[in-house]
Amino acid sequence: MDLHLDENLSTMDSLMHHYILIAILVASIIAMVVSSYGREHPLSKVPLVTEKSFWDFTGKKARDNFAANARAVIKQGFAKVGASKPFRIISDQGEMLILPPALAHDIRNVDALSHAEFMKDTTCAEVPGFEPYLESTGTTLLTDMTKTKLMSAMKWLTTPLSNSVAKSCRDLFPEDDEWHEVVLKDKLLDLIARLSSVIFLGEEEIREDPAWLRITKEYTVDSFIASHQLRPYPRYLRPFIARFLPQAQKVQAQLREAEAIITPVIERRRAEKAASTTTVERYDSIEWLEQVAEEKGIKYSPAAMQLTLALSAIHTTTDLLTTTMYEILQHPETIQLLRDEVASVVGDGRLKHSSLYNLKLMDSVIKEAQRLKPVLSINMVRMATEDIDLPDGLNIPRGTRLGVSSHASWDPKVFPNPEKFDPYRFVRLREQPGEENVWQLTTTRPEQIAFGHGQHACPGRFLAANEVKIALCHLLLKYDWELSSITMPTAISHGIMLDSDPTVKVNVRSRQSEVVL
């Protein structure tokens, strides 16, 4: 009798939850309709180029179209309003104001245009399981650590990074002279995950823990999917909706697993530090984060912050390396040119920090690949925290989401023959008087904003550039490569993200290196 009663009560509770959810959703839809059609838009003078139909009152159709065709939507927008004019779109992240590249310099250092607030809104940082996004936006800890600790340690990291790539290559690629077919991006993701763990976790054994490496690769993708599913709902509803969303539950489980792996390491280190009278120098993010947090009095979650680092570094660096390899393999004459440069610069086989700077052709090749296929079609994303007036007279109301189009990278007025891969393009630009440092891979400017521009430019771009160069030195000198299909790699649009093709297969075999790295 009691068993049946419990079952009935459980069923009633379940039904009640569903009824409450449906009621909230209906109320939210009504609120969105009233909001959409009941008042004048504060940016009504700026054209909306992706008008939604009356029946698409949630904007789902417009959002889905942008998610799949963002680059085309942006191109059509500028075709309608003119290359130097802003416009509005319905993106997969809601309505956005799209600025032309010419305005990148004007907004680069405006404090009231907040990158953190944009990320909080679009990444569902307030939802349990998404704490790594909250860690990246709630404090300056990550940026401070990168700028003060990581940057000063860069010159010491080249050798351990090179050693890590050498070991990873032996594990991931063949050591015989027979051709082997592999899915390139999968292998490079494994390589960068292992390489990044050298910086993140130092000499800790968990840096090679298969479970940890799996989480660092999967959390980014799974949380991206979950946030995409949650984003259409109002922010106050997202934590509630996440309870019923399998993808959000998966993300929460990954964070718990990460905490179980990282927490014992943090506790051991803190105990050792408390018991010791001497300071042990460690060159890894665990130590640097602890130091900066203590200096600035910042409380943080070590596990969430390690996943924040993975979010910030692993997939974006993998994408840059993959994009560069695709361009090199489509222009195989570039391979020997790069090998010759590496052999010339690293004659003794010792890859040093200064060696990376002197690989100027390689720097140009990477930047050219990034120019052709940046990781974002809209960059410098911000949310206005107060009303802003730009020098051109444009008023940006508080609460506006905005970003700058990356299309200057393909502008023939800026880059002649922009559709052509030119490995020496940036070598020549750097040879112009006074332009030596202006066109380096890590330098940002309105014409190329792949790393952002201004005060929110990617602080980790110097590490990413070094990692890609170190990886290319090993990959090109130690192996022969060729595309195994006549099908050329095609960038895939996921909203404002331009993802390098994850399906491309290549043939690889071992070769005799010009120098022993």
Curated annotation (Swiss-Prot):
Domain of life: Eukaryota
Glycosylated position list: N8
Protein's cellular compartments: Membrane
Gene: calE
Transmembrane segments: 14-34
InterPro entries: Cyt_P450, Cyt_P450_CS, Cyt_P450_E_grp-I, Cyt_P450_sf
Protein name: Cytochrome P450 monooxygenase calE
GO cellular component, one term: membrane
